């Protein structure tokens, strides 16, 4: 995605193909833009070819191809609302009804299944924010036209956008605007835009995106140069990415797709995102200089919280679908499928699956009124997802390990072992499963489960789910604040008061209940 394609120029483009979603090949080509990505001390020449990123990039490309596949049109396409006559992924179209919300859910789930739930920052994730910018554009004044333009670009073109909102864990005891040597801040204003420097961390999958949204979350700011929210193209001069160790590359070096079927293609690299005197064009700026507004872009009427948690709940439900299916297979392979304790643990995993699908459906079927006749996923169900999502994967991991034990480890090291004549008879005999399952059946199933619960990839994914909606403590404390802000707390207090008003020291205050004066021993003893 060229730095020349900004939302303002893109909105006025007349060429039909400039305002439609990319194909998979076009997405891959858009990554060959000279971006500055560093891994293991070397600059990556082409992320689409490098073994640390190439299959994960192709996993994203498959999403774009699915969008263009006529077989998926009923689920993955809906007309745009921008007037360009095109189509878009349903989640980029602000919903007006329950039917719209259910269409969003189906589309999110379809893409999530293509990732088995293990890529959380797919292109539709950022529809959670940009999908509402047209409706909530006035919040971004004096940059409201930029917000509208970004909404149109995202809906019509569906570029892949990461976000970087977390400050490096440096000098956490100081206000953010007192850490100017590290945190994102504006150094200068020019006719061309803002000159920005600083860093953000855990910019998930940013090496493979077209743009990065940069925002601020945290305590209120005092210095206006830190109050900045914007979107920047990944090929912009001054944008630098330092990638963490690649699980995809490790899988390629030490195994095969049979051995690492998830990490080898679904590794969202959580990178360090650095701006080194980068120029942010004015048309890409959403907030600047307003110390109060800079921390509110995700709140108020933005709809972002409801929408991204709806996306997250649906994706997590898909992930647990896979885990539950693998567990049903694994315990049968182990021959323990009729053991009561094992059944209880597998049943609990299915219960988590049912919980998150129920929360996702509740968000869709009970939407809250929004702006201009639009609706949002139900807020109370969204908040419930926020709390329970941080608990689910640690508990599911424990349930899998408790049920399968050493079966998760009792595996040969590489797919090549099965192609080695001296080993194959031994593997077929000693690694076979129960109930007619072959050694290959057993090893294939348990290797995927090991990737989910025991590998480095697994550890990252568990931490991802625990941190997905922010601090676990914040999720719980803010639930009280949200209840107070929405009137729920008053309603709950009122209900408790009404329940207690049904009786007092003299007994029942409800006339059709009988006081126990005729049978109460204490009352008789005092007479």
PLM feature segments, named:
Residues 1-78:
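Acidic/polar, glycine-rich intrinsically disordered N-terminal extensions of enzymes
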Residues 380-524:
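Alpha-helix capping/hinge segments and adjacent helical runs
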Residues 163-312, 484-526:
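FAD-binding core of flavoproteins
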Residues 79-211, 216-240:
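Glycine-rich flavin
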Residues 166, 332, 358-365, 394-401, ...:
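Charged/polar positions within long, soluble alpha-helices
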Residues 54, 58, 152-155, 195, ...:
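Generic structural signal for well-ordered, non-transmembrane alpha-helical segments
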Residues 343-347, 375-383:
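Short, charged, amphipathic alpha-helical segments
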Residues 311-369:
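Extended amphipathic alpha-helical segments enriched in small hydrophobics
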């Amino acid at each position: 995605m060229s730095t020349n394609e900004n939302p303002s120029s893109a909105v006025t483009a007349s060429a039909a193909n400039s305002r439609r979603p990319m194909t998979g090949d076009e997405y891959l080509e858009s990554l060959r833009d000279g971006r500055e990505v560093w891994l293991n001390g070397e600059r990556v020449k082409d992320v689409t070819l490098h073994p640390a990123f190439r299959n994960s990039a192709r996993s994203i490309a498959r999403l774009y191809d699915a969008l263009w596949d006529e077989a998926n049109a009923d689920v993955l396409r809906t007309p745009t609302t921008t007037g360009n006559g095109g189509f878009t992924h349903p989640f980029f179209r602000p919903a007006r009804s329950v039917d719209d919300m259910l269409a969003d859910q189906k589309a999110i789930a379809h893409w999530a299944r293509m990732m088995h739930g293990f890529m959380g920052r797919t292109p539709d994730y950022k529809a959670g924010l940009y999908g509402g910018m047209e409706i909530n554009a006035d919040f971004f004044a004096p940059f409201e036209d930029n917000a509208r333009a970004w909404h149109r670009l995202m809906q019509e073109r569906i570029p892949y956008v990461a976000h970087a909102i977390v400050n490096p864990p440096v000098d956490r005891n100081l206000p953010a605007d007192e850490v100017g040597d590290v945190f994102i801040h504006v150094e200068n204003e020019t006719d061309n835009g803002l000159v920005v420097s600083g860093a953000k961390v855990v910019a998930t999958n940013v090496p493979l995106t077209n743009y990065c949204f940069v925002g601020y979350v945290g305590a209120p700011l005092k210095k206006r140069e830190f109050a900045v929210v914007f979107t920047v193209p990944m090929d912009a001069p001054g944008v630098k990415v330092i990638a963490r160790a690649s699980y995809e590359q490790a899988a390629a070096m030490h195994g095969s797709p049979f051995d690492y079927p998830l990490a080898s293609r679904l590794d969202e690299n959580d990178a360090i995102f650095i701006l080194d005197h980068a120029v942010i064009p004015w048309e890409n700026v959403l907030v600047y200089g307003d110390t109060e507004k800079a921390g509110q872009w995700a709140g108020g009427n933005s709809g972002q919280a409801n929408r991204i948690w709806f996306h997250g709940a649906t994706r997590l439900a898909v992930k647990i679908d896979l885990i539950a299916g693998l567990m049903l297979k694994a315990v049968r392979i182990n021959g323990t499928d009729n053991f009561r304790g094992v059944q209880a643990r597998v049943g609990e995993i299915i219960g988590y699956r049912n919980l998150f699908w129920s929360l996702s459906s509740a968000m869709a079927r009970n939407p809250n009124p929004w702006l201009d006749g639009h609706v949002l996923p139900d807020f109370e169900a969204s908040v419930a997802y926020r709390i329970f999502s941080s608990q689910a994967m640690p508990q599911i991991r424990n349930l899998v390990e408790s049920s399968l034990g050493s079966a998760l480890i009792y595996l040969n090291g590489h797919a090549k072992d099965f192609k080695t004549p001296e080993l194959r008879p031994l593997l077929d005999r000693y690694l076979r499963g129960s109930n007619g399952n072959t050694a290959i059946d057993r090893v294939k199933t348990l290797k995927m489960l090991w990737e989910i619960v025991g590998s480095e990839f697994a550890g990252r994914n568990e931490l991802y789910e625990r941190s997905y909606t922010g601090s676990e403590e914040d999720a719980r404390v803010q639930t009280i604040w949200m209840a107070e802000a929405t009137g729920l707390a008053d309603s709950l207090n009122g209900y408790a008061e009404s329940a207690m008003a049904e009786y007092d020291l003299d007994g029942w205050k409800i006339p059709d209940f009988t006081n126990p004066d005729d049978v109460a021993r204490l009352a008789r003893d005092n007479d």
